[in-house]
A protein has these predicted regions:
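Short beta-strand segments within Ig-like beta-sandwich modules, predominantly Fibronectin type-III
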Residues: 43, 99-106
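Bacterial N-terminal signal peptides that target proteins for export
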Residues: 1-8
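C-terminal motif of bacterial Sec signal peptides marking the signal peptidase cleavage site
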Residues: 15-18
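Short, low-complexity, disordered segments immediately C-terminal to signal peptides
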Residues: 20-36
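Beta-sandwich interaction modules
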Residues: 103-116
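Edge beta-strands of jelly-roll/beta-sandwich modules across compartments, strongly enriched
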Residues: 51-53, 74-86, 124-143
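Non-catalytic, beta-strand-enriched accessory regions in extracellular/secretory proteins
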Residues: 38-78, 85, 111
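Noncatalytic modules at the cell exterior or secretory-pathway interfaces
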Residues: 61-63, 113-132
Length: 144
């Protein structure tokens, strides 16, 4: 019986030692890092026409618009050197109210960079009087 009490006492002391009191806690929650979002906006623009695309900015930062390509709608893949209007604004019914704009020809750099606060915005591509026929376009939008 003494041996059983000794084994029980040893087990109790060992478990008490393992419970050494640490008051610190370690969080295992993952941290969330929000990086830039890239969206491709593709469509067509008729002479004297426009197209727009709405998007949500999650945090204050730059919104970059790049008119990546413009091509003939009658001969897809044929690059057009025409200059179009490129703008950023806020959606308004079936259009986009322009806040900032720039003329742009297709290229691989941002033609319009605007610092924006969180909210709903839109990119608008439009004819500035140069189009003789409908064109296809692609705009890359990078934002936070």
């Amino acid at each position: 019986m003494k041996a059983l009490k000794l084994v029980a006492l040893t087990a109790l002391l060992a478990s008490a030692a393992a419970c050494g009191g640490s008051d610190s806690t370690t969080s295992t929650s993952p941290s969330v890092t929000v990086g830039p979002t890239t969206v491709l906006f593709e469509g067509t623009v008729d002479p004297r026409g426009f197209a727009f695309y709405s998007f949500q900015v999650q945090q204050t930062g730059n919104v970059n618009l790049m008119l990546a390509s413009v091509s003939s709608s009658t001969a897809p893949g044929t690059t057009s050197n025409v200059t179009l209007g490129l703008s950023i604004g806020v959606p308004s019914g079936t259009d986009c109210t322009i806040q900032n704009a720039a003329p742009a020809s297709a290229g691989l750099t941002s033609q319009l960079v605007v610092n924006m606060t969180p909210g709903l915005y839109c990119a608008r591509v439009y004819d500035i009087g140069n189009l003789k026929s409908t064109v296809n376009f692609a705009v890359r939008i990078v934002h936070t």
